[in-house]
Amino acid sequence: GQTNPVDDGPVSFAALLRLVSATPGLMRLRFTTSNPKDLSDDLMRCFAELENLCPQFHLPVQSGSDRILSLMNRKYTVAEYLQKVEALRTYRPDIALTTDMIIGFPGETDEDFEATMQLLETVRFHGSFSFKYSDRPGTRAAFFDNPVDEQVKSQRLSRFQKRQDEISLERNAEYMDRVL
């Protein structure tokens, strides 16, 4: 599961990436995602070291509010997330970052949502997968008794996605007249 630690065993994932990267004739190497709490400096350093590692990374944040992240049991804060973003961009300045965002988690206030919008402005993701919260049976959140009104969730999601689309368009324009 997403909130369970990864046991890399005797070989770390970063070491495995380095081994795979050295495969003769391998022009492009991509891995998709990591939970921010499990993203090591060694793994981030691979983006600087491995020429064939694609400069794109999906780093799901879920919310820009520490309070909501705690309710989600995410095990990291917005500040810790931003440190990962800064490190990735230091190691690979041209890295394209994408994320996941859940809008309308139970108890999400206007202030929590505005914190999410602020994170969007700060990071300026190249893209995001964003959705309205919906109950999942068997999760702690399914038992929370303070749901966000569906109309409010829809309005917030629309606002978030509209701004993300604008940022994505600006980000995509940066690739004009470039060979990638």
Language model region names:
Residues 66, 97, 135-140, 161:
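Short acidic (Asp/Glu) and glycine-rich catalytic loops that position anionic groups and cofactors
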Residues 20, 85-88, 120, 160-164:
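Hydrophobic alpha-helical packing residues
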Residues 1-110:
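Conserved SAM/AdoMet-binding glycine-rich loop
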Residues 91, 111, 115-157:
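C-terminal, non-catalytic macromolecule-binding modules
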